[in-house]
Amino acid sequence: MNLLILFFGYLFGSFPSGYLAGRIAKGIDIRSLGSGSTGATNVLRHIGKRAAITVFLLDVFKGVLSILLAKYLLLNDSWQVAVGLSTLIGHIWPVWLNWKGGKAVATGLGIFLGLSWQVGLATLGVFIIMITLFRIVSLASVSASLALPLIMFLSFSGSNLSLPFLIVSLLAMILVIWRHRENIVRLIRGKEPRIGQP
């Protein structure tokens, strides 16, 4: 039964919201444009604000839904984390799109909102602060992912810390940074575009 839930978690994550937005709105394959990601940032740059907001909310919802399902089925912390990871993997490597999906930010946010809404909101707060100051989505995404494990650790006191939650926060951080490796190179070179720039 639990393995079946992991499978459904992957399916939730692999729902190609960004790809469908491109096809429906403009008849394009968003993977062939810009960063090649199916995430909200690439959708914003090549389709528009309304489509990007829709994709962002759908991607967050995928993460939240998978964790809520795991909690509804009374799965323990380890299995909740496993379901979250399967959802994140589905988002990054969707079988329907030849394993080419998003960069794990919005769906990752949804997963952590589901696991611990306080941690999710605090991490979102870091993202909002960085995006407000610098207007560079990748910088905000990487900064929030780096802050995530610390936020997870600080949000629990002593024996209340869930080791699986802490481990998944570290894994999510690694995945987000790895998916943004090209952005990080451009950031170092001072060539990463800000919001509103092509």
From Swiss-Prot:
Record bears the keyword Acetylation: no
Keywords: Cell inner membrane, Cell membrane, Lipid biosynthesis, Lipid metabolism, Membrane, Phospholipid biosynthesis, Phospholipid metabolism, Transferase, Transmembrane, Transmembrane helix
Lineage summary: Bacteria, Bacillati, Cyanobacteriota, Cyanophyceae, Synechococcales
Subcellular location: Cell inner membrane
Pathway(s) the chain acts in: Lipid metabolism; phospholipid metabolism
MF term (GO), any: acyl-phosphate glycerol-3-phosphate acyltransferase activity
SMART domains according to UniProt: G3P_acyltransf (SM01207)
Family the entry assigns: Belongs to the PlsY family.
EC number: 2.3.1.275
Catalysis performed (reactions): an acyl phosphate + sn-glycerol 3-phosphate = a 1-acyl-sn-glycero-3-phosphate + phosphate
UniProt superkingdom: Bacteria
Record text on subunit structure and interactions: Probably interacts with PlsX.
Protein name listed in UniProt: Glycerol-3-phosphate acyltransferase
Gene Ontology, cellular component aspect: plasma membrane
One GO BP annotation of this record: phospholipid biosynthetic process
